[in-house]
Amino acid sequence: MTWNLWYVFGPFELRREAIRRVIERENPDIVCLQEVFCVRVGTEVRTFADELARDLGMNCFVSDGPWFPRRSSDEDGRDVGEERAMGNAILSRWPIESHGQVTLPGKDSDAGYRKAVHARVNTPWGAWPFVCTHLNHRFDESAVRVRQVDALADLIRDLRGNSDSDLPVIIGGDFNAVPDSDEIRRLTGRTEPRHANLVLSDVWEQCGDGSGLTWRSDNEYQADANWPNRRLDYLFVTWPRPKPMGHARRAWLAGVESEDVDGRRVQPSDHAAVVADFRVG
């Protein structure tokens, strides 16, 4: 499952319960989350992903920063030194053996603020690598996203291991790009990939039913969107892989409908989630 949670925007106190309900109902083994609300005061860090993991009985790894100061006062009016971050996270039903993050390039190839997090999960079928990311969002930043997917491909190559025998890498994220964009075509092999013998299978394209739109005009938060009705959120799995391990069997959307929270109908996020089942043998 992959889902952009829309940070702390909108009616967040209601949305956070709606988000929890959707994830609990879907009951996924792995969840890739973007725009996770993170707060740091001194050495204490609290994140919405950790909150979800506790509520759902899952393990969690959350990206670290970048942190931005936010003026916040205690009861006596003193600045508490609060910082906030918009993070990426991986939640897992099974123990996380190892984890890390990389910073993706920004404009002019400088280090940006977008990150990719990765976790190697101790599943019943062996150590399985997962990656979660969130790319730049502006319409005019396709070239930046191409550099970002190249950095992502470097990471995936290093995580993959032996493509003939090891478990494939599964990637989830908000790529802020439609399927025929240069950046997605580069990942899926429709143009020359970053690395020979490494392309990503688009799970929705292979087994999803319908358009798979995740940025939707029927979402109440999209009333003023410049370009609604796009498929921006993806689950990918690496190819080649030891078939049928990692083949996607079916894919569907979640979090599209509103939830009743405290007597009010609220949509969980401005994005729909993408959920899929994969073959494991």
Give short role names for the model-derived ranges:
Residues 12, 36-131, 135, 253:
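Structured beta-strand-rich core segments of catalytic domains in phosphoester-bond hydrolases
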Residues 1-5, 19-45, 91, 119, ...:
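Active-site beta-strand/loop signature of hydrolases that rely on acidic residues for catalysis
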Residues 9-10, 39-42, 69-72, 87, ...:
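Short catalytic/ligand-binding loop motif for oxyanion handling, primarily in non-cytosolic enzymes
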Residues 12-16, 109, 145, 149:
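A conditional alpha-helix N-cap/helix-loop micro-motif detector
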Residues 157-170, 177-281:
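Metal-dependent phosphoester-hydrolase catalytic domains
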Residues 25, 54, 82-84, 110-112, ...:
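Extracellular/periplasmic catalytic domains that process cell-envelope and extracellular macromolecules
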Residues 10-24, 266:
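N-terminal membrane-anchoring alpha-helices
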